[in-house]
Amino acid sequence: MSKKKTNPNKIRIAENSFDSQKIIADLVGKMVLRAWLLVLGALADFAETTPKSIEALWTEVNAFADIIHDSNHVSKSIKHLKKITGVSIPYEQLSTKQIKTKGDLDKFTRHANERALYIALATISGAIAEKTLLCEENSSLVFRKAFALNDEVIENRISLLDIQNMLEDEYSVCMYQVNGLMKLRIKPAI
């Protein structure tokens, strides 16, 4: 007879048994990578996308993203992303005060993942808008496609590795992390 699975909402956890800052730090890098893969995957639908244009966009957005990390810019970027996509983006503060069970911790982690992804997408879209790297119509198309790709990833119809492989095959572009920092490498043409 198989053992019955324990409900995670009934598994009590001690307040000091988890480090919320470490959880957030670990997932931020993953979600920034995911956001970039979604955006670059969406850009692949445009005929004018080239390795050089991807590298130029990457360079401009990263230079600008270093400047706009305060909450005012993030709020402005979230409003812009909502305007161009019609997607409502939750931006509530996360609290660890309600975490009493394993289920609560799982819920906190899910919300932190979503929030980190939305902030990363908003930061990228805000930089694109501020620097006018894409016209608003193309920006809207790119981010709607990025959200659609994210839905496909959630539904396991495609994977982030599929997007990464497509970028490598079609554009010789490789995304990776080093010590929590995102890197873009364009492989030289043979």
Where in this protein do the model-derived segments appear?
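A structural feature that tracks compact, well-ordered secondary-structure segments
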Residues: 129-130, 139-144
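Intrinsic disorder/low-complexity detector
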Residues: 3-42, 70-130, 160-190
